[in-house]
């Protein structure tokens, strides 16, 4: 391939251009003889195109056959019961009869449908009912057992949401058993990244999917855990145990500019957009899967996201009684309890699901000044879901969830400290965050089209007190912020059965009220002297920002020939922003100086047309190539901390990303390997600047160029043995960037919080006897934490391990994280210059976890 041939001789960005051009040439010359793997998840109309076994034309019978047919017909066998038996490895459909063995059925498999017709049988269930169960296990849409009156047969129908797993039919002494063993990972990798159900290997973009079983095995409970299992995605807390703010980066673009109005990455939980990086510390519980889309996503999602999307999908309400519980205890008095339960209120019509979690941990830092541990944390999370399905075409769901975080002071140390977890500071601070969310989703899935409406409200409230982390108490920072976000998204799109032409049209509205109630630096007498102030006191800023965003978006996918798909998408977005802001200095006696730099009703508007183009070509059912060109966009905004008009506004940011990739699967889907290469050119990247004392007060714009690649591999070489690996490389550098306040030139410096290398490797084994073992390696390349590239973390790697025993309905596990107690920093800054003050990651931790399901 051209990717290998050009690697030694050319730079990565040159490889990208050659790769895209070669891919297009290869696609044009390839024969049109491959078909895309079919995926169908609709619960109605699936059997209409499958001929009845009795309707298939049979050859004329012979005299011998005619004579044999004249013999007395044996009595019909009554099927008096249908049971579903679930285990960790498979599930069984058991047909019970008091009359003895059931005749061997005729079977037919068509796409994702399996049919078994049992001759000379009658369905005699209580009250004469037929049997149906929706979603009996993950990956199976429904199971039905019905009477076929025309030919005295009983039909069993199994519909899979993806590829059918292996199915075995076994006659028993008192009935018939149909057993399904989902050994292929495809059954778990049906995704909705493009707002339609499809195999992850058919999606023409760089995509990481973490299915439910992997979520449990890797113990994914936060966005940081998701990033640890995703190439070119880093998610770093400010310091160990901290939840006040987390720095993330996808493909070299980060959220370091926390004064910006919109994040670079779109975070969604059950279709609800999250509005600010400081509000992302939510517990992720009772999940079905996670999808991480890298690259600009503006033509299929309500909110425009220039770097990518993290899409979290919770487990939906079940039509059958279900209960799960898990508990954990570990180092630093770490304790966790999770509970979820689900059942039908009205069978097949109305169901509910409840989930909740509590976790808490003592601080990992020892404060010798106060003689107590600090940096403790606690979190309480709850979620409630109601799902109403009045007809097979309609789904109406209401979700509500809330979280409450009460954490200790974010604690920092000198980067070169002998023991960074031992500090001496006077202030015992805190960080408190509470959020609540409500969402109403109405979906129609018809034969001619699909329609979706999503209405959401999200409220967040944050209060923080932070000391300077050193003896002497020079200053304290006090922050009080709340945010209310309303959004409405509507989508109209082609039906799931559409193949040659697929289309989507959507609209989006968002209203966000962001209130800075208090952003204060409180200086002591010593602090006033150190920072050159005339007297001690509190420098207080308050502000209110309102933003209204309107957008229309859409995409068309067209197949001119069977293996080739061309797609084009577009988005038009406009946003209006308004700012009120005041700054006062409050003296120690409580009197306030006259306000300075007061702003009222400042307004700005920005708009953009955002296109996306691409193609994909399926060489055969196991190999697909794609190439895309996409624009990303972040609107202009206000910096509420700025004192002057020329620094108060920053410009809109645009990104052009060029990407080419290959997706492949081998050995009956037991091995998958995906590769993508990309280049992003960013104009007016929104950059956060510090003043002479290291405080973040200003925002400017700079140009950035990013090149990189991602490679992911999953393998199941032996039954029970799984290998998961991923690696991402990114070269993200400033271009033509000079700090206008200090006149320092940062051109060709690396963008902060964007590790050059990210990698993850997991090897796990689950034995038939119940033994479970898993080892993980995750690492980062060199990472800088400032534009000047003066504060950095050298490459490092962490090792995690788990071992346990699993029964049919329970499990008990021992775990160790950061097994070799590696020291590393997750943030850093010059304070007071030239000293480096840093936040350190968690030390080694151990613990035990138990889980059970009912």
Swiss-Prot record:
GO cellular component: cell outer membrane
Molecular function via GO: copper ion transmembrane transporter activity; iron ion transmembrane transporter activity
Main location: membrane
Pfam annotation, one family: AMIN
CDD domains: ligand_gated_channel (cd01347)
Alphabetical keyword list: Cell outer membrane, Copper, Copper transport, Ion transport, Iron, Iron transport, Membrane, TonB box, Transmembrane, Transmembrane beta strand, Transport
Gene Ontology biological process terms, A to Z: cellular response to copper ion; cellular response to nitrogen starvation; copper ion transmembrane transport; iron ion transmembrane transport
Membrane topology: Multi-pass membrane protein
The UniProt record lists the keyword Nucleotide-binding: no
Induction: Expression is significantly up-regulated by nitrogen starvation after 24 hours. Constitutively expressed. Expression is very slightly increased by transferring cells into a medium lacking iron or copper.
Compartments reported by the entry: Cell outer membrane
Boundaries of every TBDR beta-barrel domain copy: 320-854
Domain TBDR plug as annotated: residue spans: 199-315
Disruption phenotype annotation: Viable. Less sensitive to high iron and copper levels than wild-type. Secretes schizokinen even in the presence of iron when grown in BG11 medium or in BG11 without iron and copper as opposed to no secretion of schizokinen in wild-type under these conditions. Secretes schizokinen under iron-limiting conditions similarly to the wild-type. No effect on schizokinen-complexed iron uptake. Contrary to the wild-type, iron uptake is increased when grown in BG11 without iron and copper as well as in BG11 without iron, but addition of copper decreases iron uptake.
Motif (TonB C-terminal box): 839-854
Chain positions of motif TonB box: 187-194
Function statement: Involved in the TonB-dependent uptake of copper and iron under conditions in which the concentration of copper exceeds that of the iron.
Annotated family: Belongs to the TonB-dependent receptor family.
UniProt-recorded name of the protein: Iron and copper transporter IacT
Gene that specifies this protein: iacT
